[in-house]
Amino acid sequence: RVSRGLGDVYKRQTYNSFDQIESPSKIGETQLHALNLDWKRFVTHQTADFIHHEIAALREGGSTLPTTANLMHYFGGLDYFKIAKEIDVVSWDTYPTWHKEAVIDTAYDNGMCHDLMRSLKGKPFFQMESCPTSTNWQSVSKLKKPGMLFAQSMQAIAHGGEGALYFQIRQSRGASEKFHGAVIDHYGGNDTRVFKEVSRVGETLKEIRELAGTTVNSSVAMLYDWDSQWAMEDSQGPRNKGLHYLEAMLKFYRGFRKQGVNVDVIDMTCELDKYQVLALPMVYMFKEGFAKKIRSFVENGGTLITSYWSGIADDTDRCYLEGTPHGPVSYTHLRAHETLANL
């Protein structure tokens, strides 16, 4: 059973017990995709367990303050849906690369991540960090044009955020972040353009304080599955220059947002009853429990939208037999006969 789960005795690698399994490494085994996937799941489990016990120690010491952690964009190392279960409030570090591409494209990407952060716990989040001017770690750290800081802060609030905070307040004089942007720069005055724009954000937040505690109602749910992303990133074929999972998600997301439709970004544990539309971009990996939810959703009148490279493998990354797409996406009444990879 262990060998089957790791890839059907691939190249004579038969496992007779769990004691024989080593973690993926440059001096170990890297070709068993199921093993690589389980290792990433294990890392998330260990991190969530660590957070759980750290918070427990604080609670035993008498602290009742809410807990949070600085999450980061679409970080590939941890499944944030599992991490979010251990903390009270979701917050994330928001560093979009404004002015490197069309502003609207950057806004869509940043907006989708806001919606992910809101959806992790289904309640308001915090923009924990944002740069008032320019960072010092991006390949080209472009200065925010006048008004962009205000627009970025209001975007966070519009997507269900309850705070627009900064890193950093006062610019360091030395060390690695001395050129990272701040509310108060090396000049030190309060008469700079940036300081005035930060003040404008603060005054506006006071004016709209009644929005605190409100929620965003979405009729559309879009699946973001870390397991599928990990498995596709590890895949050898059909395209080894990247399968572009997040780009596929953004194509769906742009379509909804252009119509003014709010989107929740969900995982496979989420209930689907309140949604009218379910979007499944590149749902490479199907888990049977979620398959039953989708079947019920469609049978009760919900609209299902999916894409290419869906319903390919089970949760051990073993390919389904008898054709793809497998599972509820077969409601499309389509079957993939061949796969053509584009350049």
Task: Annotate each language-model stretch with its function.
Residues R1-Y10, H333, H337-L343:
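Single conserved hydrophobic/aromatic residue that forms the stacking wall/gate
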Residues Q13, S17-F18, H52, T64, ...:
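Carbohydrate-binding surfaces of carbohydrate-active enzymes
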Residues R1-M112:
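Polysaccharide-binding and catalytic clefts of secreted carbohydrate-active enzymes
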